[in-house]
């Protein structure tokens, strides 16, 4: 049975979701990992497969190859800017974003970048496009900062997203996570999204929960995984139960099946 909860995105509601998170979480064992690997191996692929919650929410629709856009870059730059502010309280959000942008451009000028990296992409933009990227990053930082300011429990910005390579299945999983809250024995993860949630946002949240647990060396799931849509004023949450972990894993495998069928039809 799913533990999906739907709430208005208010400071009080978010803090209540954090405080009421279960004290006991489920744990994924080596047997669970082996079972997931076998399921993915049964879905043949000619190339390395990369899956995340967004693909699950899009029902496995074909996607374009990755390329940087201001909307994608804003999360990386905006979060890095917030880390700067945590160490230097005298910085404003806009100044922190500009400093982060300048560091990337300096890295490219010094020749320390590779083709396809964020720094490489930024170095090829016009001044107008760089201004757009900066504005998007400031917006992301401001929105995230407002969420952080309302939290009543100790928090930290996630060091990275969760990544898990499925053994012998040519499949990589990526789970988004933005804020980690550790409260006694609880670990609550917050994921921020722009726009508004759709009908498949719950399954997407369960996928991020499952990938986060798979990426953990101990396999222990977060007590609660909270998705926040500040623009829409909505937040959803799922608990780290075995039922939700299995549901998230099943949805990832289903997405791989849908993608395989699409590739077969395209090749026919």
Map each language-model feature to its residues.
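Active-site catalytic microenvironments for nucleophilic, acid-base chemistry
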Residues: 79, 84, 211-217
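Short acidic (Asp/Glu) and glycine-rich catalytic loops that position anionic groups and cofactors
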Residues: 52, 56, 81, 185-192, ...
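Non-catalytic protein-protein interaction segments used by genome-maintenance enzymes to assemble
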Residues: 161-208
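A non-catalytic, helix-rich entry segment at domain boundaries
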Residues: 80-160
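Structural preference for long, well-ordered alpha-helical segments in enzyme cores
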Residues: 144, 208-212
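Metal-dependent nuclease catalytic regions and adjoining charged, substrate-binding loops involved
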Residues: 214-268
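Charged, glycine-rich intrinsically disordered N-terminal tails and low-complexity linkers that flank
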Residues: 1-108
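Short amphipathic C-terminal alpha-helix that caps PH/PH-like domains
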Residues: 100, 105, 205-209, 249-260
